[in-house]
Amino acid sequence: MKSVQQFISNNFLPFLVVAFAAGILTGSLADLPLNVTFAFAILTGLVLPICYLKAADLSGYLTTILLFFIAGITAGTISSQEPNEPHHIYNLIDQQRDIVAVGRLLTMPSFDGTTSQAKINLQSIRIGTDLPHQPAIGTILLRIPAPWPQEYRPGTLLAIRAIMQRPAAYGVPGVFDYPAELARQNIWVTAFSRSTAQLHAIADTTTLLQNIRYIPEIMRNSVGEFLDDHTDHEIAGLYRAILLGDRSRLPDTTLEYFKASGTMHILAISGIHLTIIGALLFSLLYWLLRRSEWLLLHTNVKKVTGLICLPLLLGYTLLAGSNTPVIRACIMSMVFIFAFCNDRTRTLSSLIAFGALLILASSPQTLFTVSFQLSFAAFISIALIMPVIQPLIHNQLDKGPMTFRQVAASLRNWALSALFASTAAVLGTAPIVIYHFHRLPLAGPIANLVMEPLICLWALPFGFLALPFIGFVPTIATALLTIGSGGLHLAVSFAELIQMVPKTSLWLPRPAVFLVILYYCALSLMLLSQGLNIKLFRRHLSACLYILLLALLIFPVSPHLISNSKTAAVNFLDVGQGSATLIRFPDNTHMLIDGGGSAFSRETVGQRIIAPFLWDSGITKLETIVLTHPDGDHTNGVPFLLEHFSVQQLFISNYSSGNKQYEELIKMARRQGVKVNQAYSGDILQAGETSVICLANTGLEYGGGNNEGLVISLQRGNTRLLFPGDIDSNTEKGLIAMGKTLSSDILLAAHHGSSSSNSPEFLEQVAPQTIIVSAGRSRKTLFPSEQLREYCTIRQIPLLETSEKGSIRLELKEQTTEIAMLKDLQKNPLRRRHDTWQTTERITVRKE
């Protein structure tokens, strides 16, 4: 018992942080009433001081840890609440509205080449033309499809006409939760203006405090404009990333180079950036202060220098945008400087824990951000792994004059230390990287060994030194930036070289949470066994356990392989204005019917939605893809799937359609070794008890356009599903005239439910028990049409829209078809889960 108490005593602060973080997790996910939470808070406040006084024994330690867990529950519950102020924009906007708003530009706008984004701090809004302005508070994220006007700088009061709405998440398990990400930045409403003509500056008087508040962002904006004007596009984007924390102007290809090489963290201002900048400031200031004899005699010059660095680092944090990663890095830097000034630098675990506690106490929801998880996982893994490896790689150097052999040995030690530190960071962050990004950069240690010095020790110092000269001697600033750009060019070239090597970056399914926990437990056990006096067999056993769990992360077992379910499942994915339907057959093979959707971001719908869903489901292979017709909203996500899911065969309606993207897709499929087949009427695309048949290739009978497509029928027993693609009403009538068997239990509405399709005659022939519409949220009055809504209402046919329900899953059983939808899709984004399905309806199989 004494050994347990001693272990807790030596690591008391880390235990408190873990308990506090676990409490935040519990409070954020559990729907606890606020009165219970406040009772917990009062209890903690009363009992905690007593526990500190009695923390010398084990019961005192455990009670204190428990109270920190309760404090975490309180913090997690309160921080995950929706805004409750009546004038908050979140409570004024419950649906999409055309709004006139007055607000102040809060930060430097970003521009990715097509769209500008800006944070606006609201003062008032007007809903409709007949109502007066009413007070409004809160921050909105404004998007404009044009470059931001340079005359509107941070602090400018603007009148804005925009479409406002609460941000909507794609209802697809495994997909990035954008509304939750915004909510953690205290943004609960987004806005869209069609052009810069809908922005107008308002003359107003500001106080001195307001002017001071916006100075860092004004300076940041000016630095960004200088970088754009005095360096080329790619270099300006890189400098913006490492100096200002703005990655929006980086070309897509450059971003992919850094992602694939495992060096994306270098482009985010983090601990390593502030460490380099802090070391540079410390060296310059220390050299200057040592010129003073009085300071040398009366003070500890190193500690004075460290304290002077504090406000300078804080100022740079403000200049870099004060984003969460920058603030976190600044807090950690300040913690280490204070520890240095108090001679407490040897307690590394306590320093890391204290920094984490400060961050979580000030912003509990930071726990759920990827940057927080990766930063501390890397930091802790390096701190734990390197002491074990260090004795194995360091040669003892002889004292005296440095010989060539000693210099070589010193360089070898440094290179090996850097390589193993990078490897330790990769091992420590691997589960988190795979969980959030579905990829593991195997070349990360080598890439970091080369690229970190090029960017952090070459480009970053010269870029930082250029900052004070921008406003005074721009020629010197330009010269320094030019020197630093050499490191950036070399880093990009090396990253491009890494990407050209096959299999240096693996795309992997999302691991189960329990597997991630077991991985870290095994890693900790292996490291502890190396430092304790235990038998060699147990050391080897812990190492084997760790290697096994690492293998399970890279080569996971599909959940369907260990399932006894013999049912077929059909998933209608929420891809916006498009269509993508995944079919899982009882033998655990898969077919995707169409794979396209809304195309408004850098990533295609395949990378953004379909692939994450497949990985989240444990699927790494797609046996078949069927494309009903060449339109982009049915095909634009398929190229990514062809690259990463070992597709065996592709069924299409036509080889040539005049659509360049579609024809390039077919060429790409052939390069990948995919068997490309044109489907004809009556072709069996999948045989067995769950069969898929091509009822018609309408392009061969009715010409091009939306009618150039396949009509697909899925049958399991007496249950039928119909996928008509985007055919119009004339083609529907043609199918009826040809005597096609159209009767189906489930119908995926033609052309996303538009009025040009889904004729009453066609619907009468199909006689569906349920109609599903795959459409986006932006044009809900058109997709589905009023005629289809009315038809379903009169006949009491359930009309399920992916724009409202999210993804819709069907389980095709012998006697029934169960329809399930995601639970809590409309809840507070900080509390909802995107992986909980809830059965809402059962359809009895109709008898022949």
Per-region residue spans from a language model:
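N-terminal leader/targeting segments
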Residues: 1-92, 96-98, 200, 205, ...
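Aromatic-rich juxtamembrane segments at the membrane interface
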Residues: 2-10, 14, 18, 106, ...
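Membrane-interface helix/helix-cap signal primarily in integral membrane proteins
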Residues: 2-6, 66-265, 608-615, 621, ...
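Membrane-embedded alpha-helical segments of integral membrane proteins
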Residues: 7-53, 369-372, 376, 478-530
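Hydrophobic alpha-helical transmembrane segments in multi-pass membrane proteins
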Residues: 11, 15, 23, 55-57, ...
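Non-globular, low-confidence helical/coil segments that flank catalytic cores
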Residues: 104, 128, 147-157, 161, ...
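Hydrophobic alpha-helical segments of integral membrane proteins
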Residues: 208, 212-230, 238, 246, ...
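Transmembrane helix-bundle signature of multi-pass membrane transporters/permeases
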Residues: 422, 449-453, 750
